[in-house]
C-alpha cells in the first residue's frame, strides 16, 4: 500500500522535540532545587533523569514504518547527596554539623541543557528540511 505521508521524518523529529521539552523541564527543576536541603518527603532533593524510548509502528512494512521518541519515565538519580560541613545550617546534623545537599551539579545540568537544546535545534532542522522537500515535490507535480 502506498503511503501518502510525505513527512515521516518530520513526525519522528516532532516526537523527539516533545521528549526533549520534558527533558528541559526536568533539568530546570533540578537547577531550581540544587540547594534544597529539605523536601516535603524529608531529606534533600534528588536529581531527576529523563529516560527515552524509541517506538516503531508498522515495523513489518519498512517503507511505512513510523519511528517515534517518547519519554519512558523520569527516575531519581541514585547518587548520594553531597555532604557539606555547615554546623549553623538549620538542616545540619546536630552531632557532625554536616548538611546533606542535593546530588545536583549545576555544571552537569547546564551541559545537559545545552545538549538538549542542540538536539531540539537538530530536530527542527529535520522538520524544515522535510517541509522543503515536500514543497519541492509538490512543485514538481504541478509543473
Language-model segments: what does each one mean?
Residues 1-143:
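Amphipathic alpha-helical polymerization modules
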Amino acid at each position: 500500500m502506498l503511503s501518502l505521508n510525505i513527512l515521516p521524518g518530520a513526525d519522528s523529529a516532532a516526537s523527539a522535540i516533545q521528549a526533549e521539552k520534558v527533558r528541559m523541564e526536568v533539568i530546570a527543576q533540578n537547577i531550581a532545587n540544587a540547594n534544597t536541603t529539605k523536601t516535603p518527603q524529608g531529606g534533600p532533593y534528588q536529581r531527576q533523569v529523563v529516560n527515552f524510548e524509541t517506538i516503531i509502528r508498522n515495523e513489518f512494512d519498512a517503507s511505512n514504518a513510523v519511528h517515534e521518541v517518547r519519554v519512558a519515565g523520569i527516575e531519581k538519580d541514585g547518587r548520594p547527596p553531597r555532604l557539606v560541613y555547615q554546623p549553623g545550617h538549620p538542616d545540619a546534623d546536630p552531632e557532625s554539623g554536616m548538611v546533606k545537599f542535593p546530588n545536583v551539579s549545576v555544571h552537569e545540568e547546564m551541559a545537559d541543557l545545552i545538549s538538549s537544546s542542540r538536539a531540539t535545534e537538530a530536530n527542527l532542522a529535520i522538520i524544515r528540511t522535510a517541509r522543503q522537500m515536500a514543497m519541492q515535490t509538490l512543485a514538481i507535480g504541478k509543473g
